[in-house]
Amino acid sequence: MLDLSYYAKTDEIIEHYGPKPASLIPIMQDIQAEYRYLPGELLTYVASKIGVTEAKAYSVATFYENFSFEPKGKYVIKVCDGTACHVRKSMPVKEALMKELGLSNKKHTTDDMLFTVETVSCLGACGLAPTLTVNDEVHPKMTPEKAIDLLNELRGETV
């Protein structure tokens, strides 16, 4: 069960957009931006407040790839595996990140909630391959070594 402050913040977000069905997506976006994921309890709550069925709210949330029902780390690292990045060895970059962070195909977020590593189909920066993003900031021409250096830089920011 979520703390009451989650519901208070959600009420503020709903009030900002107006309690109407057309506000569903921007409300969900703001909730996810606030908590780094979309808590299922809040999605049910939002549905009841704006007049959509719970099924409708969940169908929208699961349709769009950017919504997540699992908490993500402070730094979301997306490793591109599009054709250009793949042939330029993006997967060794991802493997180095996963190994360094103690992650696996089933575990994408570190226990300290600092890092989440995901694979995406294309970041649209093919000329800079292989690329990854950290919180949507593009990092071009990555190597496993550069990726580890980047992790260490990010770790330094959190001290």
Where are the predicted features?
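Signature of N-terminal electron-transfer/Fe-S-associated modules in redox systems
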Residues: 1-159
